[in-house]
Amino acid sequence: MMCSSLEQALAVLVTTFHKYSCQEGDKFKLSKGEMKELLHKELPSFVGEKVDEEGLKKLMGSLDENSDQQVDFQEYAVFLALITVMCNDFFQGCPDRP
């Protein structure tokens, strides 16, 4: 049976997290360095050419609910939900929505 588009998208969200989280330290959490690399490589149109260090520090601080200096999967999922809401809001203002 073929996976639906949404199921494929969910699989990509999960595998992308683990692709970066296993590089250093706790393999189930993103360190600041892992998060920076994920943002740079996977969301280039959101962060531009270079990840802003001050912006990354603020982002990590706002995502890191338990203050362990890392982003766990639940915190990552909240981040993706926020980006998804922003994209939805943006496209609602476009005459030819995707």
From Swiss-Prot:
Which ranges form a coiled coil?
A: none
Q: The organism sits in which domain of life?
A: Eukaryota
Q: Where does Ca(2+) 1 bind?
A: K29, E34
- PROSITE patterns (UniProt xref): EF_HAND_1, EF_HAND_2, S100_CABP
**Which Gene3D superfamilies does the UniProt record give?**
EF-hand
Reply yes or no: does the keyword Transit peptide apply.
no
**Which one GO biological process term can you cite for this protein?**
endothelial cell migration
- Membrane-crossing residue ranges in chain numbering: none
Q: Where is the EF-hand domain?
A: 13-48, 51-86
Q: Which of UniProt's keywords are assigned here?
A: Calcium, Metal-binding, Repeat
> Where along this sequence does the record place binding of Ca(2+) 2?
D64, N66, D68, Q70, E75
Misc remark: This protein binds two calcium ions.
**What exactly does this protein do?**
May function as calcium sensor and modulator, contributing to cellular calcium signaling. May function by interacting with other proteins, such as TPR-containing proteins, and indirectly play a role in many physiological processes. May also play a role in suppressing tumor cell growth.
Q: What does the record note on quaternary structure?
A: Homodimer. Interacts with FKBP4. Interacts with PPP5C (via TPR repeats); the interaction is calcium-dependent and modulates PPP5C activity. Interacts with TPPP; this interaction inhibits TPPP dimerization.
Protein name as it appears in the record: Protein S100-A2
Per the UniProt record, the source organism is Homo sapiens (Human)
At the highest ranks, the source species' classification is: Eukaryota, Metazoa, Chordata, Craniata, Vertebrata
